[in-house]
Amino acid sequence: MEYLPSLQQEFDELKPSLFELLAEQQLSDLLPPSIRYILAVATHRHPRYLLRVLNSFDEVYALLSLVVERYYLRNFGGSFTENFYSLKRERVLLTKNGEIPRAQLGAPGPVRESLKLRNSDVWKNLLVMVGIPYLKRKLDEGYDIHAAPQASLIMNGGPRYNPSDDLPPHPTIRQRFMHAYKWFLRNVYPSFNAAYYFSILAFNLAYLFDNTKYSSPFLWLIGTRIRRLSSADHQAIAKILEGKPQTPNSRSARSRPGSGLLGLFSPHNLYPQLLTSLRYFLPASIFALKFLEWWHASDFSRQLARKATDTLDIPAPITKGMISPSERKSRPPTKQKEDPESPKSALKTSSPHKRIQPPISASSYLPIFTVPLPPADSDAASSCPVCLNQLTNPTACQTGYVYCYVCIFHWLNGEHQRQIDFMNGDGAGAAWEDDSGDGIDADGDRNETESAAKTGKSRHGKWESGKGRCPVTGRRVLGGTEGLRRVLI
């Protein structure tokens, strides 16, 4: 399909294909959401300065587009994105066919000057390029706010009107305007929007089969068409980029004090230099975007991150009141020789340092079910404190501990099997014992736990299952499962 226009237009090399125009239009439509996203990210860091700009983004973008597009139309003959695709805009001659092929071949320079956009044509094109897209965005936004919810209610069999939208007994001018505006969005704008897109489709099809010179109905209204840049256009653009030739008056002006390096930063020189540099910024930004897409999609970045983390020996986080890793390493070796390959049995092994009592909830004053602190030895460093198996899909909690994603997800939701067994009295949580430094309290709690496990007595109302809390520390996890982060080990 992309060669069809070329076969039909073998005698008109300056007429672009429809696919070139669609690619240019697609690039032009991608600029506003991209800039809005970058501005939103920057607003999160500096909301004091950028929040108002983000709230008025459509107006600010329309104003900047007006300045940039006017400069490119006057100097390069096309819009910012059209210049990137080597396209331009020119007037259509009032001849029979609107074409002068002989003059185009014999005198391309004078033909270019005669078809160049005049000042009135520049403002007409600015109305089409900036004004109509701005009005379209505002109407689409207003339709999504005022008309789309009611339309969905009607389709689902809901109420057909909203009494709050009726005019009050003595309405003001603003209330009358908003009432008429909402009525237009609900009753007229859907048909108007359909006619807008159907007219563009009709002109695109007519342009594809060489039945019209205009690819858009708005270009037909202002008498402007889009063409490829000719050799005369490239020569004129090269002269503009090189700068105007120096005259004796300009040379004397440059020789004045302060007109050298500081003259480059004057508003008269900085304005065109800044706008001209956008010609190089657009392809550079596209290349950077494609590079970032490849970087995140490929496995190369993961390999580099994995190599960087292999050399780091990050110790486990220490919580106040728990046994430090240095004290755990000082255990007698005879106590750990029962089953060194099983991390579950290692947690059950007795030691001279007893575990502290479980944390107490500040709201319900009930003990919170937690799991023991993982051992600090290198063999069990990559094991999950909850399931005591090798880490699968490692996920970090806000407290700094790393668990299996399935374990921490079900734990925060209160659905883990260890929590269910503990609260039902089926067991003490596989490897958990509520010991403490106090012998009397520890024996009493241990006896109560063991008796509850033997008799199958439920612990509901006497314990908290740890739902929404860190399994090791018992601290509340802000955001629940939304606060979890994947890590690379």
UniProtKB/Swiss-Prot annotation:
The chain crosses the membrane at residues 18-45, 50-74, 119-156, 173-209, 281-308. Residues 1-17, 75-118, 210-280 are peroxisomal matrix. Keywords: Membrane, Metal-binding, Peroxisome, Protein transport, Transmembrane, Transmembrane helix, Transport, Ubl conjugation pathway, Zinc, Zinc-finger. Residues 46-49, 157-172, 309-489 are cytoplasmic. Residues 326-342 have a biased composition (Basic and acidic residues). Its main location: membrane. Residues 316-359, 433-469 are annotated as: Disordered. Zn(2+) binds at residues 384, 387, 404, 407. Pathway: Protein modification; protein ubiquitination. Residues 433-442 have a biased composition (Acidic residues). One of its GO terms (cellular component) is peroxisomal membrane. It is a multi-pass membrane protein. The three subunits of the retrotranslocation channel (PEX2, PEX10 and PEX12) coassemble in the membrane into a channel with an open 10 Angstrom pore. The RING-type zinc-fingers that catalyze PEX5 receptor ubiquitination are positioned above the pore on the cytosolic side of the complex. The RING-type zinc-finger is degenerated and only coordinates one zinc ions, preventing E3 ubiquitin-protein ligase activity. Component of the PEX2-PEX10-PEX12 retrotranslocation channel, composed of PEX2, PEX10 and PEX12. PANTHER family: PEROXISOME ASSEMBLY PROTEIN 12, PEROXISOME ASSEMBLY PROTEIN 12 PEROXIN-12. Component of a retrotranslocation channel required for peroxisome organization by mediating export of the PEX5 receptor from peroxisomes to the cytosol, thereby promoting PEX5 recycling. The retrotranslocation channel is composed of PEX2, PEX10 and PEX12; each subunit contributing transmembrane segments that coassemble into an open channel that specifically allows the passage of PEX5 through the peroxisomal membrane. PEX12 also regulates PEX5 recycling by activating the E3 ubiquitin-protein ligase activity of PEX10. Belongs to the pex2/pex10/pex12 family. This is Peroxisome assembly protein 12. It comes from Emericella nidulans (strain FGSC A4 / ATCC 38163 / CBS 112.46 / NRRL 194 / M139).
